Amino acid sequence: MTDAEEPFWRAKRLEQMTRAEWESLCDGCAKCCLVKLEDEDTGELEYTDIACRLLDAETCRCSDYANRSERVPDCVTLTPKNLEDIDWMPPSCAYRLLKEGKDLPWWHPLVSGEYEAVRLAGMSVHGRFLFEDEADMEDLEGRIVSWPLMPPE
């Protein structure tokens, strides 16, 4: 890419991206893999520190990405067609940022060139969660955390 060329995430709308470009927007933070609670009165989302059983603890990627929707029916499957409902994604999510007209943060792998930058910036769930089978699923309210909602810097 020359200096005159815009990176694809600035040059294209989300709906115009190729499948490879779309997939590369995921920074691997895995915040979308955390169990979320919705307040019945306000609709406000709260995140817990409990993660999906398919999350790979080391890479913070899905261990069965191709089959995730079959294995975990309520898994997040974000597409250009369901972007209207993106408010349930964390504020640091690249898809949400771009949909809101914002740019990618410095630690995003497409900007930094380093996959580890997400973790080093403290934007990943790495080392900060329990798996569903390790947690008391009857005490979800006791597992609510605010760090996934921190906006990107």
Swiss-Prot record:
InterPro entries in the record: Puta_zinc/iron-chelating_dom, UCP006173
Pfam families: CxxCxxCC
Family in the record: Belongs to the UPF0260 family.
Protein name: UPF0260 protein Plav_0898
